[in-house]
Amino acid sequence: MKIIAISGYKSFIGNHFYKYNKKKIKIIHYKKDINNIFELKKFVIKNKITHFVNFAGLSRIKCSKNKIECMKTNFKSIKSIINFFNELNYKPMFIFISTCHVYGNSNNKIKENSKISPNSLYAEIKLKSEAYIKKNYQNYSILRLFNVYGPNQPKSFFIPDMIEKIKNNQSIKIDKSVRDFIHVNTVSRVINFIISKEITGILNIGSGRGQSLKSIINLIGNKLDKKPLLEISNKKSKIVANIKFLTSKGFKFKKNEKNFNI
């Protein structure tokens, strides 16, 4: 029997994952500080956790403001969890939420073994955690999420920021970048699939479809019935997932699930 626990249940993705599964599967919240390994040990042992999904951690913006706390929460806590799991007489599946920001820009769709080029402290520490997990544990899935969006996303993220600026008739400065957007409910469905099939290793989690920032903003404008005030530079970058590994395991996108839809 699978006993699934999550940390970071108040986070954007963690909260959606819980709500998405509320009537589907039982999920137990770890509600205490992820850095408190003593409490975590008691929680895992008491509940006989078989699958642990770690949504806890500082965001990219918060990491840039507090390097020490970022290292503590986004790396040292992961190290402590892995060390603890290795002490158990069984090995819970550890699902680690990572990021596409560990990659650099690429004209081609990015594979799991594509060149690594973290572009921020947040990405560097995610990569550091990945490396520790890979070296010291076997039963893991590392999920490199691309541009996740959905309801109630914090305003510091791209989509809610654009919605706010369009509503307020603010000028929007962008470049000719192309990104891979995936809805948070689809991410939840992917995680369920990975748990049910016990898929291990590193997986890109995106739609596999590249869309320009301009096209996304115009779609938002159409939805709001307001024309965005765009200033577009000639700078270009592209980060789009190759999702063949995920689909080769049997995951199938629903009709229109790859399309951007707010």
For each feature predicted by the language model, list its residue ranges:
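N-terminal Rossmann NAD(P)H-binding glycine-rich loop of SDR-like oxidoreductase domains
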Residues: 2-22
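SDR active-site strand-loop-helix element
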Residues: 7, 52-56, 94-100, 143-145
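C-terminal substrate-binding subdomain of Rossmann-fold SDR/epimerase-dehydratase oxidoreductases
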Residues: 18, 166, 170-262
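Adenosine-cofactor binding site in Rossmann-like domains, unifying the SAM/SAH pocket
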Residues: 25-43
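Glycine-rich NAD(P)-binding loop of the Rossmann-fold in SDR/ketoreductase-type enzymes
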Residues: 35, 65, 69-80, 116, ...
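NAD(P)H-binding glycine-rich loop region in Rossmannoid oxidoreductase-like domains
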Residues: 37-73
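Conserved Rossmann-fold NAD(P)-dependent oxidoreductase catalytic core, especially the SDR/UDP-sugar
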Residues: 79-121
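NAD(P)-dependent short-chain dehydrogenase/reductase
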Residues: 119, 131-180, 184-188, 220
